[in-house]
Design a protein with these regions (language model features):
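N-terminal mitochondrial targeting presequence
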Residues: 1-34
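Mid-domain Rossmann-like dinucleotide-binding core that forms the NAD(H)/NADP(H) cofactor-binding site
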Residues: 171-254, 258-259
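NAD(P)H dinucleotide-binding glycine-rich loop of Rossmann-like/cofactor-binding domains
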Residues: 124-207
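Rossmann-fold NAD(P)-binding glycine/threonine-rich loop
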Residues: 299-316, 331-334
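Glycine-rich beta-strand-centered segment in the early N-terminal region that forms part
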Residues: 52-69, 82-131, 170-173
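Glycine-centered, small-residue-biased loops immediately flanking beta-strands
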Residues: 293-294
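C-terminal hydrophobic helical "lid"/dimerization subdomain
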Residues: 33, 235, 283-287, 326-378
């Protein structure tokens, strides 16, 4: 609260007048202090509600006004009950493009008016995990937004540790392209391409041509592999994958292993990226990997899977799991700005924020709507 000594005379006089005569002064405080937000109200039920507008809680916080957000497959997993850390009542969302409205006293890299990408990972930059290059496991952050704290599917969002959790946009790149750099492309790149050790002249198979699988596709090409094989049930998605640079596409079915072996002359695949998150696709990856190869899992698994060590124990394979750290975001911004990658092509549907419940309905039945990634505009 302001003290009277700091208020200009007009405000002091108004204050005295109001106190003396008990005047009722109209206010818009409620409309200014509340906002619309998409809430995990119950299992299977996204609900648009009115919530209090967030405020600065710590000097390292920023408050941002959302410009665009999107829906992640992980949000759907939350509604299925697969994410135990996310409680009902949570405002969802961990991706977005926004404008900084307010910063805490300790925020030094950003100021009100800056247009930013909101990272899906909150990083304090100082804990042992952050210093070891694993901000996804930050002891005061990590995957917090839309999980353990309120997220970006709201008109305003509080961003903890703003200096380590926001990135300035590239002015010459589209907002839709940079929205995909909040999570989708960094996840495909870091968890798939980097963990999978994609390299010059190698062979790559990506099981699942959804947004994250396509993120792995466009970034794997930075390393000039010999073959990139996309595998999916959806032929339209495979058609887009071919347009984005896949050398081969395979419609998943009873003969998928034989088809991939034919493409690779019977050797199998050096890097298999699992980008779906169900037992059947994890088993398929184990059948496709070559001797000495890597299975890089980036799918979110909500059920137990089988690891067939009776078949793999002597194949010298590597199996990796990872939560995205989003350390690659500054580099990916440069690639988008230069036109080297074009993730805006993932955006197939646009909605106004007031229609976000409909956006969830469409994204939840993505194949029926030929939907890859929805963009929600404020």
């Amino acid at each position: 609260m302001y003290s009277l000594r700091r208020l200009p005379p007009l405000f002091i006089n108004a204050h005295k007048l109001n106190a003396a005569y008990s005047l009722s002064v109209p206010t818009t405080r409620r409309s200014m202090a509340t906002m619309k937000a998409l809430v995990y109200a119950a299992k299977g039920k996204p609900t648009l509600e009115e919530r209090p507008k967030p405020t600065i809680l710590k000097p390292t916080d920023a408050i941002v006004k959302m410009v665009k957000t999107t829906i992640c497959g992980t949000d759907l997993h939350i509604f299925k009950g697969d994410v135990a850390t996310c409680d009902t009542g949570r405002i969802l969302g961990h991706e977005g493009v926004a404008v900084v409205e307010q910063v805490g006293n300790s925020v030094s890299h950003f100021k009100p008016g800056d247009k930013v990408i909101v990272s899906c990972i909150t990083s304090c930059m100082t804990c042992s995990n952050c210093r070891q290059g694993m901000p996804s496991h930050c002891t005061d952050g990590g995957w917090a937004l839309g999980n353990t704290i309120d997220g970006t599917q709201a008109e305003y969002t509080r961003i903890p540790h703003a200096d380590g959790s926001l990135h300035r946009v590239a002015e010459t790149a589209s907002d839709d392209a940079q929205l995909m750099l909040s999570d989708t492309v960094p996840t495909g790149y870091e968890c798939g391409v980097l963990q999978g050790k994609v390299k010059l002249g190698s062979t790559v198979a990506i099981v699942g041509s959804g947004p994250v699988g396509l993120g792995a596709l466009i970034t794997s090409q930075l390393y000039s592999p010999l073959q990139i094989i996309m595998i999916d049930l959806n032929e339209k998605r495979l058609s887009l994958a071919r347009a984005l640079g896949a050398t081969h596409t395979v419609v998943s079915g009873p003969n998928v292993v034989e088809q991939v072996m034919q493409i690779t002359s019977g050797r199998g695949v050096d890097t298999v990226i699992e980008a779906v998150g169900i037992p059947a696709t994890f088993e398929l990856c184990q059948k496709l990997v070559a001797v000495g190869g890597t299975v890089a899992n980036l799918g979110v698994h909500g059920a137990k899977v089988d690891l067939h060590l009776e078949e793999l124990w002597d194949k010298n394979i590597t199996l990796t799991t990872r939560l995205v750290d989003a350390r690659s975001t500054p580099m990916l911004i440069k690639l988008v700005e230069s036109g080297k990658i074009q993730p805006e092509k993932f955006a197939t549907h646009n909605f106004a924020f007031g229609d976000i419940e409909k956006a969830y309905s469409v994204f939840g039945a993505a194949e029926a709507h030929d939907c890859l990634k929805v963009v929600v505009n404020f």
